Regions:
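Auxiliary tRNA-acceptor-end handling modules of aminoacyl-tRNA synthetases
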Residues: 8-65, 69-311, 329, 333, ...
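Solvent-exposed, acidic/flexible segments
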Residues: 312-319, 323, 423-431, 468, ...
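Conserved catalytic/binding loops enriched for acidic/polar residues
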Residues: 451-817
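The catalytic-center signature of Zn2+-dependent metalloproteases
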Residues: 18, 343-366, 428-485
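Solvent-exposed, polar/charged alpha-helical surfaces in well-ordered, non-transmembrane soluble domains
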Residues: 39, 317-324, 328, 432, ...
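Extended catalytic-interface subdomain
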Residues: 374, 379, 385-393, 434-442, ...
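Short conserved micro-motifs at the rims of enzyme active sites and ligand-binding pockets
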Residues: 79, 126, 317, 402-403, ...
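Sec/Tat signal peptide C-region and signal peptidase I cleavage site
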Residues: 2-7
Length: 817
């Protein structure tokens, strides 16, 4: 289920408006306290009414809209979805779901109540005592009431729903998503109401008043102009879909923490003496074979994606290819053409088709500067059945994928050594993005472990990568194969990997003979247990302390992968100007390309952070053969990580000092950029949580641990390597870094644990080195810098002495100098 916007408070949007046409003197229900009078049908639904039959009969009489609810639909649950269909230019995009809620209508005398329904608390036995207890204790919120205006044939009831839409009920409102304070009913109009057999679709033009705060949808970095401040009006197109939940609920499938899946959870009460359990089921599409006995069968109903009408024609073949890539995984479990991607039908083919109809899964192309895409879904809260999963592709994701491909792998692909990339290559990158987002709409979350399961050798192998790509799941953020080197011939773009086939089998594979979710458990456990022998089938969420669960990384050795990636960055810088600067034009593209390349360099270096003090999670269940689920990163790898930083980052990277490039678009700032890249990593290396893990590792395995003392010594030695020279010279970039080292370690003196005492010892040791080196420095800048460092260290060690107080002499601590 999509997250709902925050509830409306007193005096907020819609305050004072009658809810559902009931409350308030003189409202549709008549004077306060007066019972509503049920009129003859013809007086309410006049001969001039425009009516449409479907889930409910809908009627328009002048400017009022009525629903005629059949008696057999009272008490039935329906899904109500609100979508931002159109938006002003400054909001970037529409076609975004903002609310969804399960509701039901029930009759109470001459009124109809609209209740919000949840399925978060249930009983194991629907006919048992616990179910009766829950029913006695449970009450569902009444979010609106309606007077019954008239009744029709077969006890149908007619209610006025006009104010549901123009009155901005909080439960269905878009105001929180657009940063508005309230809706203005006088500037809000219902455009159309259509009723279909399973759903009702309502479109309206709604005007809100700005000032609600928050972050409006689509307003992200670089996403178009700001809102017109000369008016407080925000006019949008809204779309409400009311959809009948399946008459035959799909059999749910139980989740397993070892297999990543979007899921729906509820609390379940069992017998009187049993504890309350949390039951988690997969969010997945209903997929059933036409011929259950056939090894390969088409589904009764394929998962169908429609290509939105706004998708540029030249990109549609690539989008379709990206969608249908998943068919290979479904064929492995016996489904032929499980996924279908097609154009939306023409009016001649299907005059009733509406791509905004929530019954249809439509890939939308959003005219936005947001460099992203996402794959949302809406599910039946009773069973997890996915009812809609419409991927959203922002137009500027093309720019993002172009820049990433150029920065990461252009040395391995001559086509990419000139910007912009050729159309066919851009199409291949778009297909990859679509495949990833469609995976989300099938129920799969990000698997951040997948990019770390291939070895460096495998990533450089043409044969391996042609078969599996560069990560074991396309649902990771592994991106393009920056580990591959020129001449390797390896595949550069991700594809479906072993984990994707495995996860689809777990979620969609048929289990013959199973009648209940519990019946499926033995077979599902057998599938999940295959992870024991095959690490490529393992799942993991992103973790800052686990080097195998990072974002945007590749390979089972972060240090070596980064070393190889930096070689490719160096190669890109060799042809950056030629690739990005076009004769006769300004340097905007060059500046963007440079920033992308530098950003990629920083990202690859950050992957190594998790190695230091890192813990690797196995996420296996009891009996799978592992003794523990968490294992420290070996000390040798941690030491190698710090060595990489000393060599490739703390020694001033020559690649970042390129005035021949940067002065084409920026007069200064090189020194600041170098320091920013260094200080972020330095701060991360000595963060308290990392130091506490390292101290604990040392306590548990003192002979084999990489200790906090080791880390501090390695950093001090690397960052102050000039101090051992006979005539030390410290350049501008290193002076900046060394000052940052002192202030960073000074900041640790107020921390807790071993980090505090060892930071103090490190500064005392450093003070002695700096004092000795200051007398040997030849150039004025270095001498001034070293004397300034002495003062800064004294300030950190004992501010009283530095300020002229009566404290102990600086450095008078029980540590060697």
């Amino acid at each position: 289920m999509l997250a709902a916007a925050s509830a409306q408070g007193p005096g907020g949007p819609g305050a004072g408006l009658p809810r559902g046409g009931m409350q308030g003197p003189g409202g549709p229900g008549g004077p306060a306290g007066a019972p509503a009078k049920i009129k003859p049908y013809a007086e309410v639904i006049t001969k001039d009414a425009k009516s449409d039959d479907g889930l409910f009969m809908t009627h328009q009489v002048d400017e009022k809209y009525y629903w005629e609810i059949p008696a057999d639909k009272l008490g039935a649950e329906v899904l109500w979805v609100t979508t931002l269909d159109k938006s002003p230019t400054f909001y970037g995009f529409g076609q975004t779901e903002v609310q969804d809620r399960v509701v039901r209508f029930e009759r109470r005398g001459d009124k109809i109540l609209l209740r919000s329904v949840t399925h978060t608390i249930r009983a194991e036995d629907p006919a048992g005592d616990m179910t009766r207890s829950l029913l006695m204790a449970k009450v569902e919120p009444i979010i609106a009431t309606f007077d019954i205006k008239t009744t029709g044939n077969k006890d149908s009831v007619v209610i006025d729903v006009t104010n549901v839409y123009t009155g901005d009920m909080a439960e269905f409102s878009a105001k929180g998503s657009i940063g508005a304070s309230r809706m203005d009913a006088s500037r809000t109009f219902i455009d159309s109401v259509k009723s279909y057999p399973k759903n009702i679709e309502v479109k309206l033009t709604a005007t809100f008043v700005a000032g609600g705060g928050g972050s409006p949808l689509g307003r992200r970095g670089g996403d178009g102009p700001s809102r017109d401040s000369s008016t407080d009006a925000i006019t949008v197109g809204l779309h409400h879909s009311i959809v009948s939940l399946p008459d035959r609920p799909m059999m749910a499938r139980l989740a397993d923490s070892r297999v990543g899946w979007f899921s729906t959870s509820h609390f379940e009460f069992g017998t009187a003496d049993a504890p309350v359990k949390t039951i988690t089921v997969l969010d997945r599409w209903r997929l059933e074979k036409k011929d259950p006995r056939a090894a390969l069968s088409e589904p009764v109903t394929p998962i169908t994606y429609y290509l939105g009408s706004e998708i540029p024609a030249k990109w549609k073949p690539y989008v379709k290819r990206g969608v249908e890539e998943w068919n290979a995984a479904f064929e492995k479990i016996g489904y032929k053409n499980a996924i279908v991607c097609r154009d939306i039908p023409t009016k001649a083919e299907d005059p009733e088709f509406d791509q905004d109809d929530v019954r249809y899964t439509v890939i939308r192309w959003l005219p936005s500067g947001v460099e992203n895409a996402y794959g949302p879904h809406i599910s039946d809260p009773r069973t997890g059945e996915i009812l809609n999963g419409s991927p959203k592709i922002f137009h500027s994701v093309l720019k993002l994928s172009n820049n990433w491909y150029f920065a990461q792998v252009s040395p391995n692909d001559p086509r990419a050594q000139k910007l912009p990339l050729p159309e066919s290559l851009q199409g291949d990158l778009l297909a990859y993005v679509v495949t990833h987002e469609v995976g989300h709409t099938l129920g799969l979350p990000h698997n951040m472990r997948a990019s770390s399961t291939f070895s460096i050798k495998q990533l450089r192998s043409k044969e391996w990568t042609e078969k599996w790509g560069d990560e074991s799941s396309i649902m990771d953020y592994g991106r393009f194969n920056y580990v591959s080197q020129p001449g390797d011939g390896a595949r550069l773009i991700p594809k479906l990997g072993p984990y994707d086939y495995f996860a689809i089998e777990y979620g969609y594979g048929a289990i013959p003979g199973a009648k209940t979710p519990a019946d499926e458990v033995p077979a599902l456990k057998a599938i999940a247990n295959r992870q024991t022998q095959n690490p490529m089938l393992r799942f993991g969420n992103q973790s800052p302390e686990d080097p195998t669960r990072q974002s945007e990384d590749l390979g089972d050795d972060s240090v070596e992968a980064t070393r190889l990636g930096l070689k490719n960055i160096d190669r890109v810088m060799g042809y950056l100007v030629k690739a990005a600067a076009k004769p006769g034009e300004d340097y905007e593209i060059l500046a963007e390309a440079y920033n992308t390349v530098m950003g990629q360099r920083g990202m690859e270096l950050r992957h190594v952070l998790a190695v230091v003090g890192g813990m690797i999670e196995n996420n296996q269940h009891a009996g799978q053969g592992t003794q523990v689920n968490y294992t420290p990163v070996p000390a040798g790898k941690q030491r190698a990580a710090v060595r990489l930083y000393n060599e490739q980052l703390f020694q001033t990277p020559a690649i970042m000092v390129r005035p021949d490039i940067t002065r084409k678009f920026n007069p200064s700032g090189i020194a600041d950029a170098v320091l920013a890249s260094q200080s972020g990593i330095l701060s991360g290396l000595v963060q308290d949580s990392r130091l506490k893990r390292m101290s604990e590792q040392e306590a548990l395995t003192p002979k084999s641990a990489y200790t906090v003392a080791n880390l501090f010594d390695d950093l001090r030695t690397g960052i102050f390597s000039e101090l051992v020279s006979a005539k030390p010279v410290v350049d501008l970039y290193r002076r900046n870094l060394q000052r940052t080292f002192v202030s960073t370690f000074g900041g640790k003196l107020t921390a807790s644990g071993d980090g505090k005492s060892l930071a103090r010892q490190t500064l005392v040791t450093l003070r002695g080195q700096v004092k000795n080196a200051a007398g040997r420095a030849v150039d004025r800048a270095t001498r001034a810098h070293l004397h300034d460092l002495l003062k800064a260290i004294d300030d950190q060690l004992d501010p009283k002495v530095s300020a002229g107080g009566s404290g102990a002499p600086a450095g008078a601590f029980p540590f060697p100098r």
